Amino acid sequence: MLAFTETAFSCASPRRVVLDTNVLVSLYVFEDSRFAPLRARIESGEWQAISNEACFEEFRRVLGYAMFALTEERQQAALAAYGAVVTRFAEPPAVAAAALPRCADRDDQKFLELARDAAADWLVTADKALLKLARRDRLRGLFRILTPERALTDV
């Protein structure tokens, strides 16, 4: 199991972002040039990428999908690159938390919960089920849900 790296940032207050698995695959597998500035902002410390064990484990699992045909070495390289810059968020103690809308895809609910619990500024996703929730009143004052394209323009 890959350990998360504790990362110190020189920025006074980096933007706290949660990246869903599809975005991570674009950044760390395909190295999508359209989104290279997202990765650069994370690696420079301008943005603080946040994950927890459940979200990181989903990334690990998806890297093994046959459709990507990634070697074990390539999977480990992607995990190591992200693991080197992500801040691990430990699960908070059970306390009353702000209510969240329910995502149509139950597997994506963990990203909403992480964004709320880690006090993220943004949840960056290309997932339609998550993007549908972007305008929900329950999210106001908590965090924004943005596409990668929008995250690049809303700096």
Residue map of PLM features:
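Short, hydrophobic alpha-helical packing/hinge segments within bilobed ligand-binding/sensory domains
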Residues: 38, 111-112
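Short secondary-structure boundary segments
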Residues: 53-54, 126-128
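Short, flexible helix/strand-to-coil boundary loops that buttress conserved ligand/catalytic motifs
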Residues: 28-29, 63, 134
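Short, well-structured N-terminal submotif of metal-dependent ribonuclease cores
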Residues: 1-51
